[in-house]
């Protein structure tokens, strides 16, 4: 698999993270593999039906993220894991800025790859887990032209009635998203601290915005 194909499926997987659901009650009743099956189908259908998304309309994708991300993703945990130990020393303001910039980075990084989605389908493998499990890995396979692409989602069962399952990491062909960014973020934190990381993310997002503008 080449970098372009990897980016394409990382983009699809990231949009699954951002897609969320329209009904929290429905999500709470769904098994994690059933949830991923439905979200994957909805995401692919949305991409195929929306010309703006296909052309990488970042504003529209960000609007989708803003409206749907919270129900199905523990984005605070995802960001905290990517930042690493330094997260514990971050102020509430720094934590919010890190989440905001990281979300924009993910959307802008993968929005261009979404235009390449065409006739693909996603098959989710049946989940083998105990009803008492609090964390699971849901495995899926993207099928279309060329070799199938493996996607995996790490999910947690959130406490409280009606909370359901939430995604906190994803794997595209053996590469976990959070771990990939953790190594990048660690270099910036070691050199310039948390504020330096925030500034670097903001600058990267501005540069990506100019390229897409």
Regions found by a protein language model. Give the residues of each.
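Low-complexity, intrinsically disordered terminal/linker segments enriched in charged
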Residues: 169-213
